[in-house]
Amino acid sequence: MGPLTFTDVAIEFSLEEWQCLDTAQQNLYRNVMLENYRNLVFLGIAVSKPDLITCLEKEKEPCKMKRHEMVDEPPVVCSHFAEDFWPEQDIKDSFQKVTLRRYDKRGHENLQLRKGYKTVGDCKLYKGGYNGLNQCLTLTQSKMYHCDIYVKVFYAFSNADRYKTRHTGKKPFQCKKCGKSFCMLSQLTQHKKIHIRENTYRCKEFGNAFNQSSALTNHKRIYVGEKHYRCEECGKAFNHYSTLTNHKRIHTGEKPYKCKECGKAFSRYSTLTTHKRIHSGEKPYKCDECGKTFSISSTFTKHKIIHTEEKPYKCKECGKAFNRSSTLTSHKRIHTGEKPYKCEECGKAFNWSSTLTKHKVIHTGEKPYKCEECGKAFNQSSRLTRHKKIHTGEEPYKFEKCGRVFTCSSTLTQDKKIHTGEKPYNCEECGKVFTYSSTLTRHKRIHTEEKPYKCNECGKAFNRSSHLTSHRRIHTGEKPYKCEECGKAFKQSSNLNSHKKIHSGEKPYKCEECGKAFILSSRLTQHKKIHTGEKPYKCEECGKAFNRSSRLTQHKKIHTGEKPYKCKQCDKAFTHSSNLSSHKKIHSGEKPYKCEECGKAFNRSSRLTQHKKIHTREKPYKCEECAKAFTRSSRLTQHKKIHRMGVVAHACNPSTLGGRGGRITRSGDRDRPG
């Protein structure tokens, strides 16, 4: 059997077959053929360049060639060492099978060196290239290139072996510029272009520059909307074959990449690589603008847009613009209502796979991300990152309009919407509008009465996972959030933040109607309903309406008689946990709320607020019937009953109401004590 020739490793396509391939598949074929030729040259099988290779290098269609044109001539001279002998893209299984099958037919033991050369390094023409590569390799890897009579190196660098290299995690090729390592030389070559900014491929539509033609092709598919690869399971289409492969694992549940540190498995190798940085703490991507570091390059790229404020991806439906194509794709689902990711545990559907992943943790209770400072654990790495800023005091996001600083960019975005008044999310049931889609989702549960989050301890259900988390602390007694000022502890971080404002006196939310200021935006929203008289929450049992859903929930317990909160000290039961908390202070004698004006102390903040009105003489609650004003809304409510009972107008005058000895009759006369 003679030595291997290019004909043995060439794959032919007819014109019809070639036209059936898409651009990505044609590029893949081109890369495979060029690699086969480079490998033959590398082995010292000196061939004149076949017309097929010339054609492929000029990016012409190979199917237009005749069969005899593909046959290589007898050996003439040895070609130079091809440094980038590995292709830039992964070879598809179909091409792998054909190529490796052809290698097997001839046998790699028959891949002979050119006569007169005992080793690959003997060839003078590519000795320099070989020596350059040899310096990059370990001693073991270097020996792989030295063979006596037959060349085994060809098989050593086959696709099968390259696949093994990926799974063993070996990364012999290191970038001298930043120290990053790669398992393939071609990956290192591509990576180097990032440093030299060799962005030769430019998008004519948006002006974006890329250092790979494949990256430009991928980019074009984003705005063209070209999606060739469709999932047979759910019908979803993708613009890359690799993305489809990764997507299929959602259905199969396959997770072939496992972390040796904690045992967690992943469906993608890249996700495993990123995950490993949680354990190592590595953050190789640094922002030149603000100095912030990132463990993932994609997160770093997204972060950069914060500084540029570039938003190239626009929604055709509503005109809203985004800085990520993925965010636009997710946003479109608001208009279509599509929720392709479904939880098998409870049937809940989501429009993002990442949201489904986060949701699943509710059922498992898994909290793999632990704070080294205080030991608190979280189910999301992003929440751990946010939590750490409590210890460091870092607040990198500042809104110049109000001067407020935030630990998260998302919180800054939310705050901006408060000032602009933007509310793009509309409830179809009642017409109410919201600033955030998540708030609309929660609001809808009022109409559907859906409560997917259930307490295993007492069976109580909630419409928010955060409410369930807070509720569980009633059973455990856990209060992880402590005030450094007075030592008071809270079950929720939001309660601690609200409490801190008591000490600082900060009240950023002001009512335009009466000028009253509040610590929380939610309190301002509730307060506004006093002026509008809006009471959207109605009791089906008795028809009574309320301006807060929480008050309706409390009211319903009057009908059911439910009192789930019991005092261990005296066995007294309450309908609300807040009432139990207030009651406990009777036993302890605790009165943490003190009046700065007169020094009087109270066991409830609401009572201190009411008391302060004695000093300020503030009476915000006014009777529309007779203009009488009150310090409390409850007093106004009681007063209104006088008008409803048909009492004459002068009964509103305190002088006509007299002392305590009489009672008011329906006619307005007072019964005198006998």
From Swiss-Prot:
GO terms for molecular function: DNA-binding transcription factor activity, RNA polymerase II-specific; RNA polymerase II cis-regulatory region sequence-specific DNA binding; zinc ion binding. Residues 653-674 are annotated as: Disordered. GO terms for cellular component: nucleus. A zinc finger (C2H2-type) spans 145-167, 173-195, 201-223, 229-251, 257-279, 285-307, 313-335, 341-363, 369-391, 397-419, 425-447, 453-475, 481-503, 509-531, 537-559, 565-587, 593-615, 621-643. InterPro entries: KRAB (IPR001909), KRAB_dom_sf (IPR036051), Znf_C2H2-type (IPR050758), Znf_C2H2_sf (IPR036236), Znf_C2H2_type (IPR013087). Residues 4-75 form the KRAB domain. The modification Phosphoserine is found at S605. GO terms for biological process: regulation of transcription by RNA polymerase II. The keyword Transmembrane helix does not apply. Pfam families: KRAB (PF01352), zf-C2H2 (PF00096). It is found in: Nucleus. The keyword Zinc applies. Gene3D superfamilies: 6.10.140.140, Classic Zinc Finger (3.30.160.60). Keywords: DNA-binding, Metal-binding, Nucleus, Phosphoprotein, Repeat, Transcription, Transcription regulation, Zinc, Zinc-finger. PANTHER family: C2H2-TYPE DOMAIN-CONTAINING PROTEIN (PTHR23234:SF8), ZNF44 PROTEIN (PTHR23234). May be involved in transcriptional regulation. This is Zinc finger protein 429. It comes from Homo sapiens.
